[in-house]
Amino acid sequence: MSWKDTAEPLLVRMPAVQRPEGHVPFKRKLTWTGGVLLLYFFLTNVKLFGLDIDASQQVFGRFSSILASGQGSIMQLGIGPIVTASIVLQLLGGADLLGLNTQDDPRDQILYQGLQKLLVLVMICLTGLPMVFAGGFLPADTAVANSLGIGTAGVQWLIFAQMFVGGVLILFMDEVISKWGVGSGIGLFIVAGVSQRLVGGLLTAPFLGNSEGIIYTWYLFITGERGTGPVLAADGLQTVLLQGELLGLFTTVLIFAVVVYAESVRVEIPLSNARVKGARGRFPVKLIYASVLPMILVRALQANIQFLGRILNAQLGSMPAFLGTYANGQPTGGLFYFLAPIQSRGDWMWWLEGTAQPVWQILTRVGIDLFVMLVGGAVFAVFWVETTDMGPEATAKQIHNSGMQIPGFRQNVGVIEKVLERYIPQVTVIGGALVGLLAVMANMLGTIGGVSGTGLLLTVSITYKLYEEIAEEQLMEMHPMMRQMFG
């Protein structure tokens, strides 16, 4: 008896959002999407009952925007468990250990979806329990424990229960948008979090109870309330570029432009319809073929490694120096320091006197981060293409089933697949590595609002794809016959 026969009774009974029986009108899709986004914003402002907020620590740091996490809220875990479960499934699927044919076998498709949800529930527990009980990241409020009479341990379990509910909610919110809305729930949650930080980086001011945004900082420069020194001198130029966030603004605009341009770069394979004379089309293989979503997997893997290091440091008191040394919850040496991604200019600009590490250690850390993002971006892009039916074989079947063929070639799935194999694997690797390079460079130069480079890349790419999907939906609303072509 295989593992599929053993696990099938459980996996097929995993709760799921019902698929629409027919076509969902575009306006209704927008309603579902907007409603789920409003619910997400609401839940990120629902604080965990029983949490000592003043003593709590930021768990994910700058990874929070990528993981759509709301610090100290019921959305504390964000999409982290979903992403981690996807990493595990992609690694198992890539090694062909699951034995699931998700392309042609409906039973295996149901088992895969059930296994994914089961893994998400496991990851919610594996991520949430250490936050509450092991690392001291989310301490219980003793006043609440005394008033309820359940002790500190009881309040800790209460905090974990709320986080568990939040993790399950975001899982099904993502599924609702995927089936009834526009775009991907995970992508929209990331866009929502990053957009908040971008707007905050522009508009915040001390009198609003926040730090200084770009507009307020330049108001101080222009009115003379804050001096810059001679702009042509080194100190003055540094003040304008760094404190005035001109460098961050330039990087943000540059990333927007590069991603939009990269999304438009493509190889177009001509197609024709064998049954309808004169009907022609093109299949685009974009430079960023796998999208930037696989980059979430790379950053989530790094976030989990850093999370593990902080837990070990909290539990052991002090780890062996070769593993890691910590100050204020951040690695300052050892293996975990070298594996920590570059998050800001202060992590590597040693000439600003903001780093305590020797130059060789800083450069080694930069090199490791660059290597991880380039190789990881390419590898996870390949996994993503294969597991989302975007590979040559699955795409060839889709083209063949739609009645299209490549002019000058026989109408055969194998022939179409061979043509696609000339482009898709190579473009996937190049695009994944390019996205990794852009993410590292954006982090090193800094962006508006302290948004991570990966978060900015994700936001731009997801927004661009959302625009394309909305245009496609509107086209299908105007021409219902197009629904069969788009699927």
Curated annotation (Swiss-Prot):
Keyword Oxidoreductase carried by entry: no
Keywords: Cell membrane, Membrane, Protein transport, Translocation, Transmembrane, Transmembrane helix, Transport
Coarse class of the protein's main subcellular location: membrane
Residue ranges annotated as Extracellular topological domain: 48-59, 136-153, 204-244, 314-364, 447-451
HAMAP family: SecY (MF_01465)
Family in the record: Belongs to the SecY/SEC61-alpha family.
Biological role stated in the UniProt entry: The central subunit of the protein translocation channel SecYEG. Consists of two halves formed by TMs 1-5 and 6-10. These two domains form a lateral gate at the front which open onto the bilayer between TMs 2 and 7, and are clamped together by SecE at the back. The channel is closed by both a pore ring composed of hydrophobic SecY resides and a short helix (helix 2A) on the extracellular side of the membrane which forms a plug. The plug probably moves laterally to allow the channel to open. The ring and the pore may move independently.
Name assigned to this protein: Protein translocase subunit SecY
